[in-house]
Amino acid sequence: MHHMLPALAAAGFDIVQPFDGALLDPSRRAGLLVGNTRALWPRFLAARPPGPDPFDRFIESLIDPLVPADARVHYGHRQPFPPLQSIAVESGLGSLSPTRLVIHPVYGPWFALRAAIVMPGEPPPPAPRVTSCTCGEPCRSALANLKMDDWRSWLAMRDACPIGREYRYPDDQIEFHYALLRMGAPVG
């Protein structure tokens, strides 16, 4: 499992968290939760594949070659959708906010979970849980105005979080992902 960490980092996945793979597959106890911050965006722009679902295909093109034959990848954009948020909380990657966004202790809400890789092996030792998100007044106000079907209110919720503001996605990345939401597609 640990042999994959440098390759995933080199591919642009700057969030990789070990977890107990039994959460997805009892026969594959070693797991890696794979995510990224805005650092992956320039790589996507340089490689942007033509055709439908370019970001999802880009993610797969980076991860698939790194996965051993005896491992399984559960992508966040493919059905059945894996419980990536639950895995993030259980593994100690972040805490769940009242909005159901996972809040990373450094990046805040400005990261994305892409895949869970499970393989034979020993699970990692239990990780300490991240302290629960404590919404201050800006977060409470944004939460009170949150409309589940309005992408602008979701963006306002992320912007209200004081954690990780310096890791906010660039405007073109926000536009790309929230344009998908406006069209009714899953956002990655």
Regions found by a protein language model. Name each.
Residues M1-D64:
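Non-catalytic, usually N-terminal nucleic-acid engagement modules in DNA/RNA processing proteins
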Residues G31-L32, A39-P42, G51-G188:
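Catalytic cores of enzyme domains
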